[in-house]
Amino acid sequence: MEKKKYFISVDLEGVTDVTAWCETEKGQDGYERSCLQMTSEAAAACRAVLEAGYDAVVRDGHDSARNLRHELLPRGVKLMRGWACHPGSMMAGIDGSYAGAIYIGYHAPGGSNGSPLAHTMNYKVIRSVKINGKLASEFTMNSLYAAEQGVPSVFISGDASICRLAAEEVPGIGTVAVKECRGNSTFNMHPEDVCDMIQEEVAKALRKEVAVRRVDPELELEVSLTSHQAVRKALMHPLIRQIDDSTVCYRAHSPRELNAILDYIIG
C-alpha cells in the first residue's frame, strides 16, 4: 500500500527575520512574532502536502516544543507538542509508515559562521558536534534518524548555510533559503514570499524521487562542550572518552544510539 503521510519537523532559528536569541525564547522580545512566522512557514508546507493528497503530521521541535499555533495550521493537520523523552528528539514519532520527512526553520550548525544563531541542540552546553569527522547539524542527525526508519528527507527550509549543507548530505533534496546571514545580521526574504516559495518547492519535492540517505554502520561522535563541568558530567558514562580539555567522543552504531548519548551529554 502506498504511503500516505509526510512528517514535518519544525524549528524556529531558521525562520525568516529571526536574528537574535531573544526572538526564540518564550517571554522575550520578538518571540510571539517569531512563532507566528514559524507557524506560517509550517502551514505552507502542510498546504503543499495536503494538496498532493497526503496527510501532514507536524512535530514542533523548538525549545519547549510548544510554539506552533495549531489553530493557524490547515484543518486536518496533526501536531505533536512537548517532549516524549524519546531518542528521536525533533523526529520523535516518525516511523516507516511515512513517505518522507520535511524540515522547516532549520539553521546552521554550532561551530560554523552560517548564522548568528548557529548551534547544535543546546548552545549553552554544546559548542559543536562532529559525526565521523564532519561538522554535524541538527538536520544531519535528524535525517540520519529518518533514514534509520527507512524514510527519505525530501525538503528543507532555513538559512542559506543549512540549505547548502543539506544539499551536500542529501543530493536531490528540495531547499528554500529564507535568509543569508552575515556576522550577527540576517538578510531576509519577505515573510509572505517565503511561504509562497515553501509551498511551491515542497509541491515540487513531493513529485521527485529522493533516496534514503546512507547510514554508516559506525558513527564516531565528537562533542565540543562549553564548560569543564559539562565534560566531567559526560565522562560519568563508562563508554564516553575524553579527547582534550573540552571535547568528548563516543562510538555509536545507530542514529538512535547517537541521539540517546547526546541527550545524556546535554543532561
Please report, for each region that a protein language model flagged, where it lies by residue.
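Glycine-rich nucleotide/cofactor/substrate-binding loop typically near the N-terminus or early
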Residues: D17-T19, A42-G96
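C-terminal accessory domains and tails appended to enzymatic cores
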Residues: K4, C181, V194, Q199-G267
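Short glycine-enriched loops at secondary-structure junctions
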Residues: S9-V15, H62, I104-G110, A160-S161
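Hydrophobic alpha-helical transmembrane segments
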Residues: M1, F7, D17-A20, Q28-G30, ...
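Active-site glycine-rich loop that binds ribose-phosphate moieties when present
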Residues: Y123-Q149, S157-S161
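Active-site rim beta-loop-alpha module in soluble metabolic enzymes
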Residues: Y145-L206
